[in-house]
Amino acid sequence: VSRKLQFRQQGKLPEVWDPVTGRIVPVTLFEQGSQRITLPLTLAPYESKFVVFRAGTPKNQFTGIRSSHADPPLLTYREKEVEIWEEGEFELLKGRESRRIVNRLSERILDGAWEVYFDPNWGAPEKVIFPGLHSWTQSEIEGVRYYSGTARYEKEFTQPALPAGYPDTRVYLDLGELSHVGEVWLNGHSLGIVWARPYRVEVTQFLVPGFNKLVVEVANTWSNRIVGDALTGQKFTRTHIPNTIIRGVGRTRVAWKDVPLIPSGLLGPVKLISLQPVKLAD
């Protein structure tokens, strides 16, 4: 969601603090009223941000952004600029002045087959080719369907050169949906861990024209392995837990064989998103 927020502050400079990454970014798009500061802020599902005000005097900053709908566009603050995550025409406001911008997003889906490596010590084959991304629970292979643990996805792709004349282009890798935690590498460089929407990392620095190799490790919970052990009826199983409590049905205990499988793995769609940041200061 993206909303215009008001704070009872005067004569101070707002900053956005990210409690997950620890990143602190000055807000470069706000309006100082007689008793309040107004600014647009975007939050992903379940996301939290701190808005902190430090001493300082506003200096000729843009005061707002206008779009075709009532709420501000989805945006991310960066140092002296802002990234807009919607296509369309927008108007930056500064007093009686305005600046029209046309925002474009370029998306490329990384479709096709993936090589997926599992831990064979936990019942799955060591390597499976996925023609497309889907939940492990949809697999015809029993060891994959009930797998709990970490799997490594690998994919090679060719990237065209970025268009000339756009030196400030930023490129992000968006993993779509995954369950439950992922870690990303591109061309051998670790890009960090993703565990909440949007499952997105910046790849500008490490994406190269030509051949690229993407690796995503995904880990799920124990639930599916316990369900599988309860269903298969094998003499030797890796777990032996008779029943559990399912959220939303009170304190009634349910046999694990009756518990639904939880979608797991990299679900996608995985895509590269390119955008041009909007400069708000020199």
Residue positions per predicted region:
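Short beta-strand segments within Ig-like beta-sandwich modules, predominantly Fibronectin type-III
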Residues: 29-31, 191-195
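Aromatic-lined ligand-binding clefts that engage carbohydrates, nucleic acids, or primary amines
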Residues: 6, 157-159, 163-187, 194-195, ...
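Short, well-structured beta-strand segments enriched in hydrophobic/aromatic residues
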Residues: 48, 169-171, 209-234
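A generic beta-sheet turn/junction motif
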Residues: 9, 177-179, 207-209
